[in-house]
Amino acid sequence: MNFSNSIKYSGLSAFSPNSVYLAIAKTNSLIIYDNEELKVIQKFSFQSPISKFLWSPDSSLVLMAFYKTGICEIRSISNPKWICTINESQSGIINCLWTPDSRKVFLFNDFNVRMSIWSLVDKSTVYINSPKFNNKCILFSENGNFMALAERNNGKDFIGIYFTGDFSLVSHFQVATFDLENLLWTKDSTSLIVIDTPLEVKFLVYTPTGNLIASHEPYLYGLGIEMAKLSNNSHTLSLGFNDGTLRLYNCMSNSFKEIIELNHNINVITNENLVTVFKEEEISHSSGNKKNNFTKYVECSFPYKLNTNNKLKSLQGIGAISIIEWSLDSKFIATKYDALPNNVFIWETSTLKLHTIIVQLNPIKNMKWSPKENILLIVTDNSKLYTFTMDNVYIIELVSDMNNPFSASNLQWASDGKSFIVSDKKQMLIGHPTILEQNLPFNPNEINSEEEEFEQKPPVEPERYYPINNINNINNNNNNDEDE
């Protein structure tokens, strides 16, 4: 693998959906890089720290939210003079989202009183009251024509289906949940999967018109669903429960029939299990010193005993499945079981059996499959990156500033699978699965020198707003000015 040097940032970074650009926030500025050559394309500067930024789905615009001031600003990558500012300082902003057409923006007000939908084309605004959440349970159909929204009224849960053309209400129905926690929409847009609170062991399936298709309650007592994920082919629903099991359900059947329970409460692995176990171990010098921080993987012999977290032993093996990651081809599922927090379980869906266990020295913080091939990246809050392929496992040392040791805790892939970000709270590295000539390491000092070419701009005034369909006109006017 090939890596950049360490880059300091303020905790916010993202590839554009088309993988062409990389945006990195540095407190009061957002810097746009060409993802292939890592050269600065644009730099947007502000007086307030950026709370959140989002790429538009078409990768042409970027939205910045400033929660403290209640202002949202949108900039164009191709035309830096195009600016849209939305001022919600009176009601406040706690989150923001794009619509699939990249021409409307959702803003969520304080206390989830309402959400506002702002059009970048005609400046119109639509308001929807009582969204239950500001950061989840807002879904769009595969074609982007409809939106499903979880709502809460008079202590009861509802789902509203809206047409995204004008956000008119298409259907509205109550769901039989105690406290709706999560919402999934199948890729064929025919089924809405409703997850109840972890205090209940239940999930339900509805049609977008409000008809109940299925209801499942695997057991009666104890905590319920911790994590829910659809497979990439949308054929299988995977639910991580607090009893240490991963349950798979068939989305192709009308009743969402349960396929299997995959139990993580495993004490001993034997030859009969046909499971490969890789364990990370420290490398000792000939003197026996282990303080060099170098580690390696060893393939374990059988029988092999898994060490359960001591704090959870008294709970009789109870623990949540807190991470579920499907491979691109939906042939493998990687999971984390909180009672065995140092272990990665990899399940093979063709056999419905455990394929591999990776035992780390430190608890798993994050893991992500490549969007293009079966490569799994794993981080454990240290200066190493762990990779799993169908053939082997590898440990990669991450080089960083000696004064600021790297503690990798976050992962993010570009959609084309050619690059990824591994980061902690203050610094990040850009990695490439294969070493290509055009993806050579770069020097952050060179980037800083390029940034100085960009003029520091004052905060944007609200009246500097141009509808989306006027971008070309602005470009033409700018060209005319240059000719003069």
PLM region descriptions:
Residues M1-E484:
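Long, low-complexity intrinsically disordered regions enriched in Ser/Thr/Pro/Gly
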